[in-house]
Amino acid sequence: MNYFKRKWNETRGDQYDSWGKSAWYFETDNNGEVLRQIEAYDNGKVLKYDNQNIDDEFGGLADQNLDLSEFVEFSIEKEEFENKWK
C-alpha cells in the first residue's frame, strides 16, 4: 500500500466554498488505484470515502488511478493516514 497527503490551496468553488482549503489523503495499491480517501477542510469538516462509502452529497472516492510518480513527494507513513481515518 501507498499513502499520500496533498494540500489543495484552493477552495471548492461550489456551495461548500466556505469550508476553506483542504488536505487530501490517499491510500492506494501499487497500481495507483485509490482504496481510501480523506478530505480534511480548514473548517474542520472531514469527508471519508472507500468501497463501503463510495460517494455522498459532497463528493466521492477517486475513480481514476493516481500517477504514483507524481505523488512521490507527498508520501506519508501509514500511521498518519490511519490516525486521520479514525
Regions found by a protein language model. Give the residues of each.
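Acidic, low-complexity, intrinsically disordered interaction modules
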Residues: 37-67
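Short, flexible N-terminal segments of the mature chain
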Residues: 13-41
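Short, extreme N-terminal segment that most often corresponds to the first beta-strand
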Residues: 1-13
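Short, compact, well-ordered microdomains
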Residues: 56-86
